[in-house]
């Protein structure tokens, strides 16, 4: 699923932010403040990155500014093709253009299911909306919390896996040092670029990624790009 990440992925850009949520501290659509430094350091210390990064010029990670929408979009995209996820997401936005927790709860299970969502995904999105509405998540504090603390809070929500939480760290909070080891695109990118296409274990991936710290998000993004150079991953 990593190979279509900025394109449709973690969220739909441009949706308004619910009152219970907060945006990243910087403009999510601007160049992340650490990007230039990260590129420079990665190119200095990693021969693969030194060849890979220049191929993509000024392209960079584009964040998704609305926490609720980011997470809802990730749930919609779980275990389906990008095309099916885009279709269901489009139907959801058609019936709920201002995607916010209160509006989703008002829609209810029947209308959500009518957008092509499975019973389980419908339950997950309603539970997510309820968490935001009841303020059982601390979206206004996430920008100040460390990565593992944010992950620990998010995975308590039904339908949010560690991978989903890591995508949230990358695309909403723009954290610079996330290594999503459960992401097939990352593993495939390491395999193709560092191991000539040979199978790669998690321990292999960790060993390669140790050289990227504290910029593992940036290196991961460039490996996604190496697999899908036209559309940014989401």
Regions found by a protein language model. Give the residues of each.
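Short, contiguous, helix-prone interaction/anchoring segments in small proteins
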Residues: 66-70
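Alpha-helical ds-nucleic-acid-binding substructure associated with the helix-hairpin-helix region
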Residues: 29, 48, 52, 80-81, ...
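Amphipathic alpha-helical segments that form the core helices of the histone-fold
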Residues: 71-73, 112, 209
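Buried hydrophobic packing segments
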Residues: 72, 125-128, 190
